Amino acid sequence: MAHNLALGAHGEDLAARYLTEAGMEIIDRNWRSRYGEVDLIAAEGDWLVFVEVKTRRGLGYGTPAEAVTFSKQRRIRLLAVEWLRESSRHWSRVRFDVVAIMIGHGPQPQIEHVRDAF
């Protein structure tokens, strides 16, 4: 379990760096409510982006992006509604992205950013 938490935290750090280098601003990390947790919340222009990060070392459980199930998507949407209620800023555009990371398949992690994933 601790190994999985460390892998997840490492993946979130990689994703945050990747998104920042792509011009996005990370405005919240690991935001929690009664519905669970959003990994990253970012701004890209006038877009507010809720980001689910999935990190894997192998494909034994499928690709990282495949781990974002319908129930996980629904939970992230509920979290987004709560976050928006608490936000002092009005966001007119919201989307949900997935950052899928494979570690250990080459010298560098493989990062796939799926915009508007769900």
UniProtKB/Swiss-Prot annotation:
One of its GO terms (molecular function) is nucleic acid binding. InterPro entries: Restrct_endonuc-II-like (IPR011335), tRNA_endonuc-like_dom_sf (IPR011856), UPF0102_YraN-like (IPR003509). Belongs to the UPF0102 family. HAMAP family: UPF0102. CDD domains: PoNe_Nuclease. It holds the Pfam family UPF0102. This is UPF0102 protein ROP_66030. PANTHER family: UPF0102 PROTEIN YRAN.
